[in-house]
Design a protein with these regions (language model features):
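C-terminal functional module detector
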Residues: 1-242
């Protein structure tokens, strides 16, 4: 690119809400484009057709210190939308994942998660390796989204998905496992069952205005200078391009 004035266009479609985008010149912040605050208070009509993205993660489960033979878990599930299933981003970390039978409003999946035998100390790697998806769906605020995971079936409206995140634990299975391995022990606390249960985390959905950013401005580019963009999402993820 020749030095001088140029028109810079930024177009980002992220997997979650964008916090800000930074334009750096020679590794020094030149301009900050703040996206947070531009969409949170927008009103959505009851009959409005909207697009949202939300992340579903699978993992956690029995601690290897207590259950040494419970290192692998296979999951079977599906997602059905009363509307449209627009896109699916795979957030996979290990082998053994499968997405299939994808249609305009549904999909099926087979996932495999692994528990590491590392200590999990705060200075070391985590014992948990999660797998998941980012789903983009379209519908009205009251459109139903059905997530099936193993023997469980969860129903949410898009409106409910946008309110908060949720963790769904396979709690009874954790109790049954403890009884099978250690025998039935009555105790006033249930921490052990909760912490050793397999869990599905459904992160809070965000509307399209949150994860899409378009920006344009004229910049004066200097010869020999390095320019790059750094995108930061509200969930802490960072990406960059130069």
């Amino acid at each position: 690119i020749t030095p001088g004035k140029h028109n810079m266009k930024i177009s980002i479609c992220a997997a979650d809400a964008i916090d800000r985008v930074e334009l750096l010149k020679n590794n020094v912040l030149e301009e900050m484009i703040v996206h947070s605050g531009s969409w949170e208070n927008k009103k959505i009509a009851d009959d409005e057709v909207i697009r949202v993205k939300f992340t579903v993660e699978f993992g956690w489960g029995p601690n290897p210190r207590f259950y040494k033979d419970m290192l692998v878990k296979e999951w079977d599930g599906s997602l059905n939308v009363e509307g449209k299933l627009l896109s699916i981003d795979k957030e996979w970390n290990s082998y053994g994942q499968k997405l299939y039978d994808v249609t305009d409003d549904s999909c099926k999946f087979h996932m495999t998660t692994y528990m590491s035998t590392t200590t999990g100390h705060w200075m070391g790697p985590s014992t948990v390796v999660k797998e998941g998806f980012v789903f983009e769906v379209e519908g009205t605020p009251d459109s139903d989204v059905c997530l099936k995971v193993d023997n469980y079936e969860y129903h949410f409206t898009i409106r409910e998905l946008m309110k908060t995140s949720r963790i769904k634990a396979q709690y009874q299975e954790s109790i049954d496992l403890a009884n099978r391995v250690y025998g039935k022990v009555d105790h006033y606390r249930d921490d052990f069952y909760w912490h050793n249960a397999y869990k599905t985390r459904i992160r809070q959905a965000v509307p399209q205005d949150a994860y899409v950013l378009n920006y344009e401005k004229e910049i004066d580019m200097e010869a020999g200078a390095n320019y790059r963009l750094r995108k930061k999402k509200k969930n802490g993820d960072v990406a960059w391009v130069s």
